[in-house]
């Protein structure tokens, strides 16, 4: 381990040395560009564009372009990027991750690579975690870009397609990650190319990159339509689940968050639902509902995983503690929770298009990101995204003190200690930020502080709008702020007058998060830009992380210490180490899950790319789709003839071919068995293809102008592809649910999924070609066709 660390430190040093040289080159232009007039400086943008068009690379232009942007920032924003910020900018331009501590000016750092890459005219996307930050940065940094002669667009969820298109056509576009993904999916569902909003994905800088590419990597973006589901099954399975007793009828595995029925539970189920065998393949739907009912009742906790508000079940984001409006658990889990909470059960929805953030962002030509904490996930960034994490040195040394964890026997004693600590600091005027993992913890603490008469602000999932404002004031003298993990992320906490002398901002963590990175983010709220500060985590044996992974060693350790008093406290390096190792285990589990999700999703990705490329080809076609449609018809005809002419001639099924021709190609009264007898299979194919050519020519006559014929061809293909592709997505989802069960038969589930998925894809392509043949050849032409 020590060797590995040494290698990292060495490679970091070498890398920083290389980057430092380029940064020196940028700084060498400072005097020359500083002497230019405003107009001369602005004219540089056009000069760079021309040089780029004439074949100079962005790497060649980097030193001058960065220097121009830097001088521009000084004149427009009154900010002048430091040496370390230039280094960060180069890292971003090279498609890697710049790890910069809180308050080191990530937003300003990004201006240089954004400016340089916008010169190519291919578009630069800057991604933030919420719309508030998108608007803020687009407005503030937008002043600089427009001054330098570039256009800036802001892409928000409520904008019209027209406004979105304009935003994407700008040199620089600010957006949230989800909106970019949804626009991509919607673009691949449109039927007219004029309705598309995005340009090809070129360069993206992701702010808080760990949050989006790692914490949310598994979150699929789903566009769905209504499907016909059965709500009665949800209520029945929910009623049954509520009759069961833990340990006797079912077992809970907290580590993997699963519930499984015991033999007794299975027998009860068979009796309750009147079945011989609960796990018979015919009862697949029932089992799926039953699994969900068990999870909803015994794993998903109200006010921790979700809240119920106005008769609606709303998901709480486990990483940020925010309510995720409009998001629903998929695969029927949401409906199961609705049944559990006795609120109205919404119909299940059918997925029309989906993609994960991992695969969406991997489609960019160049992907880069910034964050305060990425070191712990170095491996994952390298393996999955092929990005290096470079730690950028701080501009001033860090003066914050991180104290070892304090461990208490019970939750109650822990919270009492937290309140005592807050009270003592508040009395001398030191500002305190208390970080909590769950919404209910922040509410409990708030109540305890009220009882002590300590004024404070609470930031949690339920209070989006005032977040930034509260965070900005969290560093004022006497301020006490309680916040769930990531609330107000991206907004700096600046220290008010007189606070430095009191020791700066005190950050108190009320429990460790399962990810070290989130703990580090909380610590990083204090001690920005060399400010003083202190951080302290309080733990108890009853914390989630301890219950799930706290080893026997800690419990024995406490018994040996004869800790009986509730307020007894231990501050020990061993405890901190145990917690770290528990966190590493969880992180390992989470990484494995994400990697596995990606391997499965890669199967879908390959298929999605094929289908989307075909759709693009169809939508973009301007003359005729005959070169696409005729081969489809030919493959369908060949396949059908081959199927019916196996073996000896006496065994051929010519009637089958005739039935196909009548149902998919020609009118009944224009063909008979006599037309097929005494022909070889090849001759039958030729005969049917000749008929198809005739029908094609006939249709061209009916649709007197080319554009109408093209429109008709597009309607046919898009209708068929879209309908079969959405069915296929659903089937692949179901395959994935069931594939895990095959692991028992010594088969590798991933390989099985790849093989079955490929076979299903082939079948879908065959079905698309058959449906296109039938729709195209048999459709009655009316003059007014609409896609």
UniProtKB/Swiss-Prot annotation:
Which GO molecular function, any one, fits this protein according to its record?
A: ATP binding
Q: Where does the source fall among the domains of life?
A: Bacteria
Which residues take part in binding ATP?
Answer: 85, 103-107, 492
| Coarse class of the protein's main subcellular location | membrane
A cellular-component GO term for this protein? plasma membrane
Name the reaction it catalyses. Answer: ATP + H2O + cellular proteinSide 1 = ADP + phosphate + cellular proteinSide 2
* Compartments, as annotated in UniProt: Cell membrane; Cytoplasm
Q: Does the keyword Nucleotide-binding apply?
A: yes
Q: What class of enzyme is it?
A: translocase
Q: What is its EC number?
A: 7.4.2.8
Describe its membrane topology. Peripheral membrane protein
Q: Name one GO biological process term.
A: intracellular protein transmembrane transport
Q: Which Pfam families does UniProt cross-reference here? A: P-loop_SecA, SecA_DEAD, SecA_PP_bind, SecA_SW
Q: Where are the transmembrane segments?
A: none
The yes or no answer to whether the keyword Signal is present is: no
Q: Please provide the record's keywords in A-Z order.
A: ATP-binding, Cell membrane, Cytoplasm, Membrane, Nucleotide-binding, Protein transport, Translocase, Translocation, Transport
Give the protein's biological function.
Part of the Sec protein translocase complex. Interacts with the SecYEG preprotein conducting channel. Has a central role in coupling the hydrolysis of ATP to the transfer of proteins into and across the cell membrane, serving as an ATP-driven molecular motor driving the stepwise translocation of polypeptide chains across the membrane.
Q: Please describe the quaternary structure of this protein.
A: Monomer and homodimer. Part of the essential Sec protein translocation apparatus which comprises SecA, SecYEG and auxiliary proteins SecDF. Other proteins may also be involved.
User: Which protein family is it in?
Assistant: Belongs to the SecA family.
What is the designated name of this protein?
Protein translocase subunit SecA
Gene symbol? secA
């Amino acid at each position: 381990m020590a060797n590995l660390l040494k290698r990292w430190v060495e490679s970091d040093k070498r890398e920083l040395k290389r980057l430092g040289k380029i940064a020196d080159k940028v700084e060498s232009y400072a005097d020359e560009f500083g002497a230019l007039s405003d107009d001369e400086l602005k004219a540089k943008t056009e000069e760079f564009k021309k040089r780029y068009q004439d074949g100079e690379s962005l790497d060649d232009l980097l030193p001058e372009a960065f220097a121009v942007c830097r001088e521009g920032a000084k004149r427009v924003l009154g900010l002048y990027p430091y040496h370390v910020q230039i280094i960060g900018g180069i890292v971003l331009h090279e498609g890697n991750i710049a790890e910069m501590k809180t308050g080191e000016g990530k937003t300003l750092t990004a201006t240089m690579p954004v400016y340089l890459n916008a010169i190519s005219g291919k578009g630069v996307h800057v991604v933030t975690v919420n719309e508030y930050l998108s608007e803020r940065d687009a407005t503030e940094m937008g002043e600089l870009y427009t001054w330098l002669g570039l256009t800036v667009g802001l892409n928000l969820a409520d904008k019209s397609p027209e406004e979105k298109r304009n935003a994407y056509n700008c040199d620089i576009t600010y957006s949230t990650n989800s909106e970019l993904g949804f626009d991509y999916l919607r673009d691949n569902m449109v039927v007219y190319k004029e309705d598309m909003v995005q340009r090809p994905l070129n360069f993206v800088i992701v702010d808080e990159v760990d949050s989006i590419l790692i914490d949310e990597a598994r979150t699929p973006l789903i566009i769905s339509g209504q499907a016909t589901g059965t709500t009665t099954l949800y209520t029945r399975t929910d009623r049954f689940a509520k009759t069961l007793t833990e340990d006797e009828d079912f077992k809970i595995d907290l580590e993997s968050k699963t519930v499984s029925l015991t033999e007794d539970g299975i027998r009860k189920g068979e009796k309750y639902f009147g079945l011989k065998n609960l796990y018979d393949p015919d009862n697949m739907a029932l089992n799926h509902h039953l699994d969900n009912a068990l999870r909803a009742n015994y794993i998903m906790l109200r006010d921790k995983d979700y809240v119920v508000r106005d008769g609606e079940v709303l998901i709480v984001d486990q990483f940020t503690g925010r309510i995720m409006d409009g998001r629903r658990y998929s695969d029927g889990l949401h409906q199961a929770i609705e049944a559990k909470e006795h609120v109205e059960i919404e119909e299940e929805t059918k997925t029309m298009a989906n993609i994960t953030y991992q695969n969406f962002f991997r489609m960019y030509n160049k992907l880069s990101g910034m964050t305060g904490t990425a070191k712990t996930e170095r491996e994952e960034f390298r393996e999955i995204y092929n990005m290096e994490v470079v730690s950028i040195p701080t501009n001033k040394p860090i003066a914050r003190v991180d104290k070892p964890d304090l461990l208490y026997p019970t939750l109650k004693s822990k919270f009492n200690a937290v309140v005592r600590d807050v009270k003592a600091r508040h009395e001398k005027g030191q500002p305190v930020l208390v970080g909590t993992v769950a919404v209910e913890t922040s509410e409990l603490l708030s109540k305890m502080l009220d009882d002590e008469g300590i004024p404070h602000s609470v930031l949690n999932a339920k209070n989006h709008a005032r977040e930034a404002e509260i965070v900005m004031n969290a560093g004022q003298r006497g301020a006490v702020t309680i916040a769930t993990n990531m609330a107000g992320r991206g907004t700096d906490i600046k220290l008010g007058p007189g606070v430095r002398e009191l020791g700066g901002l005190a950050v108190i963590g009320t429990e460790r998060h399962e990810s070290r990175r989130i703990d580090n983010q909380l610590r990083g709220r204090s001690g920005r830009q060399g400010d003083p500060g202190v951080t302290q985590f309080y733990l108890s044996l009853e914390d989630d992380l301890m219950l799930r992974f706290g080893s026997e060693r800690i419990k024995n350790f406490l018994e040996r210490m004869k800790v009986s008093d509730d307020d007894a406290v231990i501050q020990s390096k061993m405890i901190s180490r145990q917690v770290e190792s528990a966190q590493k285990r969880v992180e390992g589990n989470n990484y494995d899950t994400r990697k596995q999700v990606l391997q499965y999703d890669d199967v879908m990705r390959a298929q999605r790319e094929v289908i989307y490329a075909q759709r693009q080809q169809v939508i973009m076609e301007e003359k005729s789709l005959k070169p696409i449609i005729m081969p489809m018809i030919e493959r369908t005809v060949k396949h059908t003839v081959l199927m019916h002419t196996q073996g000896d001639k006496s065994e051929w099924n010519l009637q089958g071919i005739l039935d196909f021709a009548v149902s998919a190609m020609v009118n009944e009264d224009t063909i008979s068995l006599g037309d097929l007898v005494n022909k070889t299979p090849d001759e039958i194919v030729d005969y049917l293809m000749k008929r198809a050519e005739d029908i094609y020519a006939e249709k061209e006559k009916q649709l007197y102008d080319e554009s109408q014929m093209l429109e008709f061809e597009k309607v046919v293909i898009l209708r068929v592809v879209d309908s079969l592709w959405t069915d296929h997505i659903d089937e692949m989802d179901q395959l994935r649910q069931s594939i895990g069960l095959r692991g028992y038969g010594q088969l590798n589930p991933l390989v099985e999924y790849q093989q079955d998925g490929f076979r299903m894809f082939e079948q879908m392509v065959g079905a698309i070609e058959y449906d296109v043949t039938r729709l195209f050849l048999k459709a009655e032409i009316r003059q007014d066709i609409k896609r």
